[in-house]
């Protein structure tokens, strides 16, 4: 039975994580690491309270009121993070109603992959996750807090916040989202405009107009990429107030949900983060990822998060869970609908309700919504509403309101989850199958090897790629150049696919959570910088990518005995040299110390 199989997966993870999990918990709850404001010197305490309202200084300084940290990713350029501007004031005001207070302990950086996509700044993107984790730790290192709020939404921000928060797992913690922007132009129309521009059918001004109709307001992008997959995972891990992920920023309900976050932390009922996040909650996040067709980036981030609390998750677990969990949602790029339409027809509450009903979720996982009378994931089968200005929760719908977007377990879009692990003589890689049509899931074609994204785009522009081929792009892994997303290739590969050509991508780099219809074997491990087999591929090699059978192979008899393609010898020799420009040289030590994609691509030495 599926439930038994999930239990077996959990037991395997628990067994392999026994020593690392025990060590993590021992360190986190060591008496030396607990909040110590009452034992600080008077001068130290005065520094804590100096900027606070006068009437709060003595109560907080003498620990007669709870004092919570706010770690915020606010900036006012990025649409998803602009709404966080007023959250600290909302939280502080609500906490004072409950004899508590909060301070903004730290800001963390928040960069947008949508801005740097295809440009050199993207090489900082993955490492920004680890910088965010470090920045979170700096903010909490004053060690005077009783708990913490984490304000963040987008791609590397939420994983970075959670990795940092788990270093302070003795604190009760709540994650607070901002929600998606209201719907603009349909995502498929935006994608078509990009392809039309790539083919020279529309000009730059026409494309810009379409893009601005898509990205037009505050909130996250409305497609189901990494940012919105983050929000899903926070729900499935029980770190959000229930079903707060996909409420638009300017909806009056959003303010009330922020206030509810403050109430939950002030209640004293929220467990320390280290006790709340365990094998069950991590597996629940993975189950949610598969059931909704979420972002490939979480084959990195969820592993890094798990290892940060002593849980050893690996790609085999992703494969095993994918075999058990049906695909219940079709949200762009997996379908044409956006997350607002997904929310309107039942949303995460319906997905969780369905999975629980069929025994496909760990119901007894701890959450921030746990109370003495109601514990576990059942709290997340309810949807928030405003009635007379008050927050009320009602049971999720029993039936999807649009089965083109959301379906029950009994009638899924597919029997298996949205992500798979490919294996073969190139190593192991990740593919997102939920957005790929059946007729494109197997590609057998000759390789064209590229040194850079720019070379690919130039050759496409010159009409040199109008044929069946597998694009091979090595040295895009974490040790090579920080593992940038290669989403800019999607438009061009998609255009070639629409012209009737059989095309695919093989790379040790990443793709955006928005990437979809072209079969792409990504995160290939070992990567090129570790002399992975990808560096042996030559132009003209016959490659077979078979997503239905989880296989990726070079079909050349001499392949296993080959050396490195001479095209890349100079690249290998220069790997330890810093890349200059846009601050990339400052990240050289992170790049040289990063572990593998299968280990989460972490750069600060967590060895779990």
Task: Locate the predicted segments by residue.
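Catalytic or ion-coupling anion/metal-binding cores of large enzyme and transporter domains
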Residues: 1-76, 80, 89-108, 119-121, ...
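Contiguous domain-boundary segments centered on the initiation and propagation of an alpha-helix
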Residues: 129-136, 143-147, 457-468
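A short, small-residue-rich loop immediately preceding and capping a beta-strand
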Residues: 136, 140-161, 174-176
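N-terminal small/polar loop signature for handling phosphorylated ligands or for N-terminal nucleophile
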Residues: 105-143
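Acidic/charged coordination and interface sites in well-structured regions
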Residues: 86
